Amino acid sequence: MNYKETVEYLFNSTPVFEHVGATAYKDGLDNSHALDAHFGHPHTRYQTIHVAGTNGKGSSSHTLASILQADGHRVGLYTSPHLVDFRERIRVNGVMMPEEYVVDFVREERSFFEPLHPSFFELTTALAFKYFAEQEVDIAVVEVGLGGRLDCTNIITPQLSIITNISVDHTQFLGHTLPEIAHEKAGIIKPHVPVVVGEAVAETRPVFEAKAHACESPIFFAEDRPEVLAAHDTPEGREYETRSFGTLLGDLRGDYQTRNANTILTSVSQLLSRGTIRHPESVREGFRSVCRRTGLMGRWQPLPGHPHAVCDTGHNVAGWQMLAPQIMAQPARKRRLVFGMVDDKDLTHVMELLPREATYYWTQPSTHRAFPAEKVAECGRAHGLHGSLHPSVAEAYRAALADAAPDDFIFVGGSSYVVADLLASLQEKP
């Protein structure tokens, strides 16, 4: 098999949450331990940082990786989902794993793993951990796929655990209340390993404190001593006035990045105190070069050409509580939103947050889990939102561009898969 065929095999032969949802979820770590043992426990050959949370874990993971790279480390980065290329999930110093490595891994190891019937994420996690060991990384930043306690990444013992925040998402797996979801996320807390919690509320804080106490793990709540004192956008990026690091310029835009920055800088303080980050100036350099160093896409990402347009992967109620005000704050004659969602998200409550003073281009991403564009449009109309139907993200975006005046603003999002389809279509252009 070539690379394209190998990736199709991975998607078609293993249950993939991104494609089929709940049927891909495996409750337990037996397969993860079996794969780990088969490959000789590769994750024990380098240090790790474990990042969980409902929102913000991707931005936080990439920023920490960028800072560690600026500090001179060889850094593995494991995140999900990918937007355009499967290999975005597994990087070393920002460089994606070679296509040949993926092909060779499947060809050489399928006789072992096929009888296990692993999920897609179990297999890709094993692939990542093995690759990082062979690449002799110093440290790997590992993003949790779903939840924490039973996530297949939870076989590692990191030097720092990070929980960005908790909100209601993936309730079919993690529980329907904030304390239930917090219990699952708190499952990444390990004995004697410090943990940073970015955001907590009255319902979740005791859950984290109890787990940390049981594990004898120091716990630090970023909100108790905020590192970010003020933040605002500049033409060069997002500028932060901080308690311990002076003025920082971040290349990740979006108002929600202020919360992420608070979590990241609290985590950085722990890594500095442990000697993992050796040079404080690395924080400044890493902060301003996240996209260049790690290849992160889809976070309030400017799109080429005119009018002003951005895409963002925000996909749940908590995400839209931050995105909607920022969209409305954009100086524009009209706002045009290309919008679609997948069927495990709270469509009704997200609709309640969407800007009323906007024209919508309802669409659906190319995943079996997508809400049909007709259903999204129907829900939109019930909430006083109006627009047109389009069978694909690319067609919806083209329609928005055709309708837009030079001083309009276009937003593309509602799901990671909407952004993925958009970026893939833009790359296909000659």
PLM feature segments, named:
Residues P81, T124-F173, P206-T247:
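Extended acidic/charged loop-beta regions that coordinate divalent cations
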Residues I139-V144, C152-I162, I166-H170, E180, ...:
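Nucleotide phosphate-binding/pyrophosphate-handling subdomain across enzymes
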Residues V201-K211, C215-F220, P235-E236, H308-C311, ...:
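C-terminal helical cap/extension that packs against the catalytic core
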Residues L64-Q69, F132, G380, L426:
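Hydrophobic alpha-helical packing residues
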Residues G198-E199, K211-D233, D251-D255, R278, ...:
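Beta-strand->loop->alpha-helix junctions that form or flank phosphate-binding loops
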Residues Y78, P194-E199, L337-F339, A358-S366:
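Short internal beta-strands
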Residues M1-G53, S60-H62, S66-D71:
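Short functional linear segments
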Residues A22-L29, H33-R45, A70-I156, Q172-L174, ...:
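ATP-dependent carboxylate-amine ligase catalytic core
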